[in-house]
Amino acid sequence: NDPRPGGHPRTMKTLFLIRHAKSSWDDTALPDKDRPLNDRGRRDAPKMGERMAKRDVKPDLILSSPAVRALSTAEIIAKQLDYRRKDIVVNERLYAVEADDLLDVIHKLGDKVERVMLFGHNPELTELAHRLSGKITHMPTCAVAEFTFDAKSWSKIGRIKPAEVLLDYPKKS
């Protein structure tokens, strides 16, 4: 935490919106929630986890949609970040929802949590990323949108502009 002028510590909240990696459509009989990652998804997720690990990203909390493809992506990236798989919280409110529902989940986070990752789906992730940033218009599979807010409470998210916005995805060099 960087001190502000005058010596007051800065309180930051960092939100990572992460779209699940590429999923398989091979078995058309599978319910949508049960679709697994395909080969590209299984390659891309560790790559994105490695990129975050190189930046020393350490989440306090990982929340995932219950869909197999989202939870698998969360588990792969969590491993790269030395986050215990058993500590991933599966949240039904991250599957087949609206951007407002995601924002509601964020607003209810405990304020002691400073860095949270949400693993979910489009179109709601891109919609929320655009709403927060004003500039992100597309999140490809396995994209990571990172928002840093100068805030003490998660309830401020969506009401204040982020201090920093980063977007990374597997095909970005």
Regions found by a protein language model. Name each.
Residues 1-11:
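Short, Lys/Arg-enriched N-terminal segments with co-localized hydrophobic residues
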Residues 103-108:
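Short, surface-exposed amphipathic charged segments that create phosphate/polyanion-binding patches used
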